[in-house]
């Protein structure tokens, strides 16, 4: 009688964490493999996922020399009041907008840099 994948998964689900760790160690010894190799492969996939980033954060690292123009640009981009925009501009580095599209992030960066700010897109 052979064991199906579903039966193996059910057995894993019923095991404690320590039992799973011991099983993995036994499998490493029996088959001459290492679980660390799987971690490296996952790390490679994470790099590919990072290339497909769809949401970006616009971070102002410095307001530069023309603080008044930067405050106006921050107000226009965020819709904040004068006091809040001034506080934000003076609190750099600070995220001006988070989770925006690449196009919106680049447009905001262009506007803030035109006002004299130093901006990064993350």
UniProtKB/Swiss-Prot annotation:
Keywords: Ribonucleoprotein, Ribosomal protein
UniProt xrefs under InterPro entries: Ribosomal_bL12, Ribosomal_bL12_C, Ribosomal_bL12_C/ClpS-like, Ribosomal_bL12_oligo, Ribosomal_bL12_oligo_N_sf
Superkingdom of origin: Bacteria
Gene Ontology MF annotations: mRNA binding; structural constituent of ribosome
GO annotation, biological process: translation
Record's GO cellular component terms: cytosolic large ribosomal subunit
Entry-linked SUPFAM superfamilies: ClpS-like, Ribosomal protein L7/12, oligomerisation (N-terminal) domain
Function: Forms part of the ribosomal stalk which helps the ribosome interact with GTP-bound translation factors. Is thus essential for accurate translation.
Subunit structure: Homodimer. Part of the ribosomal stalk of the 50S ribosomal subunit. Forms a multimeric L10(L12)X complex, where L10 forms an elongated spine to which 2 to 4 L12 dimers bind in a sequential fashion. Binds GTP-bound translation factors.
Protein name: Large ribosomal subunit protein bL12
Species name: Shewanella denitrificans (strain OS217 / ATCC BAA-1090 / DSM 15013)
